[in-house]
Amino acid sequence: MNKETGLTNLYILAFTHRNLPVSEIGDLHIEHDLQEDRLTKFKSTMNFGELMFLSTCNRVEFTFTTTDKVDTKFLQKFFHSLYPNLLETERHSFATNASIFSGLTAV
C-alpha cells in the first residue's frame, strides 16, 4: 500500500501570527463549553470523516479528513457554516490567508 494512500484526504487549515494578526485569529476561537455542540454539527454539515480543533493564544488549527476538493468554494462553505456571524469580508480574509496542508505535508 502506498504510504500516501491513507493520507490523501487529510487536511490542516492553520491560522497563526505568520499569516494573520493575533487579534483576527481570536475571532476563530470557540469557547470550550460550546465546542462539542458546534463542532459536532459542523463535522456533520461538512461531511468530515474526522475533525480536530486546536486553539491557543496565537494559533487556531483545524485538522480534518474529507473527500471533497478543498478550494475557494469549500473554504467559503467552511467559514459560513462554522462562523455564520462573520462578515463576508472577514470570511474571505480567513479563506485567503489560511495555511493549507494536505497529505504527507499535513503530517
Regions found by a protein language model. Give the residues of each.
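N-terminal ligand-binding/catalytic initiation module
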Residues: 1-107
